[in-house]
Amino acid sequence: MFELGTDGPLVIMAGIDGTESSVRAAAYAAGLARRQGSKLALVYIQPYPASVSPSAASEMIAAGRTTAEDLRQQMEDAAARLPEGHRARWEFYTGEGDPFHSLCEFATKLRADAVVIGASQKAGHRIVGSVAIRLVKAGKWPVTVVP
């Protein structure tokens, strides 16, 4: 997906959810974006099951908006602490639904040249596969998994 006449990725997308590994992934992606002169797209997906009551869904969506705003503020604070020449150009995006499918949609929509994501620490993901593993298996973008 690299365009002719460019020296590296134009857009690096990082999936974040507030876990330690996702914050490390965002920091890693920010460093890559800064060094490559790329735009960094930070994406938070509020997961929720399809089979929930409307009242529970609205509560989950409200909680997700709060989490997204907290993450955006955390990223703004981290960027502000960096010296001017060490900041990457970045934008923050939010979505709702299945994290894997939503991240794939964002990566396609944003024309991401690379995806960075934190490794899952959940035991069940070793059996059914984490979002990171599913992104790697999709084979559409170079994926970096940060521990």
Show which residues each predicted segment covers.
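Structural beta-alpha unit
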Residues: 1-7, 80-115, 122
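Small/aliphatic-rich secondary-structure junction motif
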Residues: 2-56
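General small-molecule cofactor/ligand-binding pocket signal
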Residues: 43, 91-95, 144
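Short secondary-structure boundary segments
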Residues: 44, 118-120, 147
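Short, hinge-like loop/turn segments at secondary-structure boundaries
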Residues: 57-61, 109-111, 133-134
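A short acidic, glycine-rich active-site loop
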Residues: 60-73
